[in-house]
Amino acid sequence: MKKVLFYVLPFAFFGCSATVDPQISMKPPAYVEELAPKQSNNVESAPGSLFGKGDNPLFSDKKAMNVNDLVTVVIQESTTQSTQANKATSRTNTSNLGGGALTGSSGVVANALNKVNAYSNIGFQTNSSNKYTGTGSQSRNESFNTTISTRVIKILSNGNYFIEGSRELLINGEKQIIQLSGVIRPYDIGQDNTIDSKYIADAKILYKTEGEVDRSTRKPWGSKVIEAIWPF
């Protein structure tokens, strides 16, 4: 019994390792961490001036300009995929070995054996064929639309912003989690302080649900283990 468990347990652990759900890391890209932040310009207002240059100047866009400012991201992501593959292979092999099965070196023996072979007519013949035909097709159409407010985490030395934000909703026992991070240009931010997700570089968008409905749609772990180790 111990020997059986010794051989079975590695496959079980292998099956469990293959059932890990895909994850996404919201950690900033390496170049964002390596680049130094942009130095802030501390501008002092001129005494008696009507038009200051502080955080709330009279003439300026109401857009994110500093660290911790908010930017609203309009997520409009759609993906369409269509794949089709066909494969066919065949192989035929024929081997035919005629003549007698008995041979001799000397003349007298060879003549005698040739007479025996003439009556026996022993030979070998093999035929083999192999044919494989396979086809596959896949079609997917996905879309995801929502809005989320993000925060300017870092202003890079070239003026671009690294933004990050998250949102959690709990509705009827179902928890919805949305997370987003990426790099944007301040020039792509609209006058209403919004930006489309298509303008985000190195975008990472995570959407997942937690609750009874999510658990009911998942395969039991036992089924996942069997599918992972089943060789056929």
From Swiss-Prot:
Single Gene Ontology MF annotation: cytoskeletal motor activity
Q: Is this entry keyworded Lipoprotein?
A: yes
Which cellular component terms (GO) are annotated to the entry?
bacterial-type flagellum basal body, distal rod, L ring; cell outer membrane
Question: Does Membrane count among this protein's keywords?
Answer: yes
The signal peptide annotation in the UniProt record is 1-15
Alphabetical list of PROSITE patterns matching this protein: PROKAR_LIPOPROTEIN
Q: Residues with S-diacylglycerol cysteine lipidation?
A: 16
Tell me the compartments it is located in.
Cell outer membrane; Bacterial flagellum basal body
Q: Where is the lipid attached (N-palmitoyl cysteine)?
A: 16
Principal location listed in the UniProt entry: membrane
- Gene Ontology biological process terms in this record: bacterial-type flagellum-dependent cell motility
Annotated membrane topology: Lipid-anchor
Which UniProt keywords are given for this protein, alphabetically ordered?
Answer: Bacterial flagellum, Cell outer membrane, Lipoprotein, Membrane, Palmitate, Signal
Describe the subunit structure.
Answer: The basal body constitutes a major portion of the flagellar organelle and consists of four rings (L,P,S, and M) mounted on a central rod.
Supply the PANTHER family for this chain.
FLAGELLAR L-RING PROTEIN
What family is it from?
A: Belongs to the FlgH family.
Q: What role does it play?
A: Assembles around the rod to form the L-ring and probably protects the motor/basal body from shearing forces during rotation.
Q: What is the name attached to this protein's record?
A: Flagellar L-ring protein
Its lineage reads:
Bacteria, Pseudomonadati, Campylobacterota, Epsilonproteobacteria, Campylobacterales
